[in-house]
């Protein structure tokens, strides 16, 4: 009996979800683009500069609103504060394309905690 009840509940859940799906896609006419990347802070090593240039070139086409840097934004010993010189050498001098002069939102990973 439990299996039958579970099956009916599952069927009703799927049916309700399938019926409630979006059908008017015009709300997606306005595009919203952004970058999500991680392991960016390599102080110029590991092809960081060519990748940054490619991000800028792609940005000319897609027009990203912001960059979400998801962890490990400062290898190898983290940063001490928002005024740490690594922000300049890891980001400002590397990601210098005009299309990358947008908001950056770094998410701290395990490498950031070493310096602070």
For the regions a language model picked out, list residue spans one by one.
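N-terminal secretory signal peptides that target proteins for export/translocation
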Residues: 1-2
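Sec-dependent N-terminal signal peptides
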Residues: 5-14
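Boundary at the C-terminal end of the N-terminal hydrophobic targeting segment
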Residues: 18-20
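Membrane/wall-proximal cationic-aromatic binding patches
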Residues: 23
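Active-site neighborhood of divalent metal-dependent phosphoester/pyrophosphate hydrolases
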Residues: 27-51, 56-116
């Amino acid at each position: 009996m439990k299996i039958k009840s579970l099956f009916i509940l599952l069927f009703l859940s799927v049916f309700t979800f399938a019926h409630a799906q979006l059908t008017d896609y015009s709300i997606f006419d306005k595009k919203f683009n952004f970058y999500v990347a991680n392991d960016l802070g390599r102080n110029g090593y590991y092809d960081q500069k060519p990748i940054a240039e490619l991000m800028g070139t792609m940005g000319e086409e897609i027009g990203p609103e912001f960059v979400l840097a998801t962890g490990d934004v400062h290898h190898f010993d983290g940063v001490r504060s928002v005024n740490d010189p690594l922000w300049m050498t890891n980001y400002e001098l590397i990601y210098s394309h005009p299309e990358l002069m947008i908001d950056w939102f770094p998410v701290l990973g395990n490498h950031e905690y070493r310096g602070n």
